[in-house]
Amino acid sequence: MAVSPDDPLILVGRVAGGFGVRGEVRITTYTEDPLSIAGFKALKRQDGSPALTIASARKTKDGVVCRCPGVETKEAADALRGLRLYVPRSALPEPDDDEFYLTDLVGLTVRHIQTDQLLGRVKSVQNFGAGDILEITPDLGGPTWYLPFTRAAVPEVRVSEGLILADPPALVGDHEGPEEKGLDENEELGDRD
């Protein structure tokens, strides 16, 4: 099933495995309210094909536990572990004027807040465990780089204008950035003060 570029799919959760012996499915949700995933009912795979239909859901300390037609055993639920769950962008409620979805940041132009220098475009939003970061593709080529998605580094987001104003931390190697502190050639990691 083709995914429409006008209505892209948005990742809202991931199957964590089975729960109990009756085929209930544990889902880690990426929604503000974990139970809101049950409101979508039919969840899709990344290619747009059907993934799961939620008949009922309840919140647990680790996410949401759902009953899904066609998943009747713990083994069947465990076999779904890792399955990413998507919904069309149009299924999400519209954010308030001063709010946005992280997916709305992809493709926005990034400019330096003080110099107006073009820094690049947002390629993706990542989270490796320490908070959201923006992967930036420089417009003039070169390797992508990461920008912490914090108020200090990203003081302004103007989704309607397609713009992010950023104040990136100094990069290692910049003359104004932090000094690089390497090891002496005879020093071992454990010997540093």
From Swiss-Prot:
It is found in: Cytoplasm. Residues 168-193 are annotated as: Disordered. The keyword Protein transport does not apply. Keywords: Chaperone, Cytoplasm, Ribosome biogenesis, rRNA processing. Its main location: cytoplasm. GO terms for biological process: ribosomal small subunit biogenesis; rRNA processing. Transmembrane segments: none annotated. The keyword Cytoplasm applies. Pfam families: PRC, RimM. The PRC barrel domain binds ribosomal protein uS19. Binds ribosomal protein uS19. An accessory protein needed during the final step in the assembly of 30S ribosomal subunit, possibly for assembly of the head region. Essential for efficient processing of 16S rRNA. May be needed both before and after RbfA during the maturation of 16S rRNA. It has affinity for free ribosomal 30S subunits but not for 70S ribosomes. This is Ribosome maturation factor RimM. The gene is rimM.
